Design a protein with these regions (language model features):
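A short, hydrophobic beta-strand/beta-hairpin element that forms part of a small beta-sheet core
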Residues: 124, 131-144
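Conserved, helical-rich catalytic subdomain that frames metal- and/or nucleotide-binding sites
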Residues: 94-98
Length: 161
């Protein structure tokens, strides 16, 4: 639907509104933070280490520059819970996550430690996330699936982010 007066695409605005959540309510402290370049653009990602589409998305995210990515490990598969928890017990959780999602390298730490996995599962459920991966832009717009890096770049431009 287009408003004739100024040719504004009302359908696109409605679509963004209906597929958005409040970015400020995301508990970023429960995510693994990785910064590339100046980190000025932001994304939140919900990802399961045993999800093949999450692995594809991770490869696409590696192509982006000047971005801060907050990865909420959303262990929705039973076999993902233990390694997801152990990621946070490693000296460098970001590196442990990268090795787990990209290479399938299991975390080596065997000690129990505080981790946000149960909170992340509850958060995902409260947001109505039914699968992985999910990409959330800093304006709250969310997209499901392994989104190509070129699409993410285009969406940043279209959304004015």
């Amino acid at each position: 639907m287009v408003r004739l007066k100024d040719q504004k695409n009302l359908s696109a605005a409605l679509y963004v509104q209906q597929n958005s959540l409040d970015w400020n309510k995301l508990p970023l402290k429960d995510a693994i933070k990785s910064v590339k370049g100046n980190g000025k653009r932001q994304l939140a990602v919900f990802s399961d280490p045993n999800c093949p589409y999450c692995k594809q998305l991770e490869a696409e995210l590696n192509k982006l520059n000047d971005v801060t990515i907050y990865t909420f490990i959303y262990a929705i598969k039973a076999q993902s819970i233990a390694p997801s928890k152990q990621v946070f017990c490693e000296a460098d959780p970001a590196l442990a996550w990268k090795n787990l999602i990209a290479k399938g390298t299991q975390p080596t730490s065997k000690k129990p430690c505080a981790n946000p996995i149960e909170r992340n599962i509850e958060l995902g459920r409260s947001l109505g996330l039914q699968g992985t991966p999910v990409v959330i832009f800093s304006n709250g717009f969310k997209v499901n699936g392994a989104v190509p890096s070129t699409t993410i770049e285009n969406m940043w431009r279209e959304l004015g982010l």
